Amino acid sequence: MTQDEQQIRDLVRTWMEATQAGDTETVLGLMTEDVVFLVPGREPMRKEEFAATARAQAAPGGPRIEGRSEIQEVQVAGDWAFLWSRLRVKVTPPGGAAAVERSGHTLTVLRKEQGRWRLARDANLLA
């Protein structure tokens, strides 16, 4: 495994751990300023909207988020890379409401900025 691939795998691990811990600032630091998230049935989401949603979810009384990412492939080409993974997410709302579980694949494009890999584009196919 190359150093770049290891750094990308570490980014995904950090993302998952920070999301589950409600550490929005760490998650935001793992993405580029021009990041775009693509989700079926919705308009593309930019960093500002992602940040607002993530902060609301991480606030006291927000849902509990659990997840697991299984990276299937990582390819690096200079300062760009992509990965595809299988993602499982469970969101448990406060107050005893039923949890929502989703799973599916993601395709993620990363860009290396100032020596660090950051998420630049993400297509989430969870159902």
Model-predicted segments: where are they?
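Generic short beta-strand segments
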Residues: 85-92
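C-terminal-biased regions
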Residues: 63, 90, 118-119
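A short, structured loop/turn motif at beta-sheet edges
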Residues: 74-81, 97, 110-118
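A solvent-exposed, acidic/Ser-Thr-rich amphipathic alpha-helical stretch
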Residues: 5, 11, 24-77, 86, ...
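Short beta-strand edge/turn micro-motifs at domain boundaries
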Residues: 103-127
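Feature marks short, surface-exposed loop/turn motifs that line or immediately flank catalytic pockets
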Residues: 34, 91, 126-127
